[in-house]
């Protein structure tokens, strides 16, 4: 993590003097932070000393780091390349650092160097980070941070800079990362420097929901927004680390560390003990349902035009096995499979669920089939899907409004009709139009191109979207060139 445009020593000294008398206080910590001035809102906080590291810090003697007075460390687990491809990568020393810091008794959090330019990419980065922790069985004490900054190693500032996102777009990208992390039970956090927080995003919107990690390399932080961590230099020296290292303060109101948050859950009566499958949905405007639903009951709303935004399902039979479920979410597409009461979908982003798949595992799958049907915008109640089939729609931008889920003894009769469980386009086509270029894919009889604009069609691409084998074969007659080759 790097910053530009540092104050020179004279400016920093002047600001320190001014802020000392008007809005701040100074402390000298046990080992670090001498001469740094903290904003007055942190006067009653416990202030911890920490670092953040990556492969660039080489091999670290974590016992020496701990002995020197370092309380916590944020460790890079990976990042996204700043080139146009935006390839995800892992930090080669992440696992070594995570295990070493933890063994030394240092509180740990993680960060991911983001170059996300869409909400979907941001969720992908969050998913990558959490999957990394789960793969290696790493438990953390501090938040999962999105390192949102322009690429200082790139002459152009990287793909994040060249994307030229609006403040609203950048804010939504950060919120997408945070929402994904939060729905998985971790505390998310956004790292950014003062300039980005002030000029390139709506930091107050983010800070109203999630902690901020400020980067500002001064002897006092002049950023006036809310923040919980302050990275105050990239030139620190710590025993056990070769060369310079990023240094941080953490302001704790109660003296504790935590990487988990309390996810809102249904607060009303729980399902009866003899219920087989239990579920709850997060509904537009209303949030989580007050009571859980079970065994074929309707979860959600009917006739109110409210989208489902997230869902939790759990096995209540006592039989070995799990309920696994996967949702298709607006802007994000198919998300990871989730299981046994974990949240699928996203809350706080106003994104609709569009389709769902549910399946069983273990002894549960041997004894039961799972049936489910959804109330879908425009189409109403679809028929009952079974054992991993897709229920709902994709490519039509239609919201799910309600769902029923039921376990049926293996081979037993379905709860109702099973013929129409999923609505999807049969054919998609994209046209290239004079002046406008490619206009975007449309489906099943919708007009592609323009009318009334006197613009010529210059090219077309047609795709078979059915699950039936075979191809769409087409050719066009073009000005000057006549009939084209056959396209498949």
Regions found by a protein language model. Name each.
Residues 21-35:
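Sec-dependent signal peptide cleavage junction
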Residues 486-488:
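Conserved small/polar residues in nucleotide/adenosyl-binding loops
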Residues 3-14:
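Bacterial N-terminal signal peptides that target proteins for export
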Residues 35-38, 42-176, 182-184:
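Substrate-binding cleft of extracellular glycoside hydrolase catalytic domains
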Residues 277-283, 308, 313-315, 323-328, ...:
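Fold-core signature of tandem repeat domains
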Residues 297-304, 315-316, 342-350, 360-364, ...:
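Tandem-repeat/low-complexity and Cys-motif detector
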Residues 186-198:
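Aromatic-lined carbohydrate-recognition surfaces of secreted/lumenal glycan-active proteins
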Residues 34-57, 63, 206-270:
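Functionally critical loop-and-helix segments that line ligand-binding/catalytic clefts
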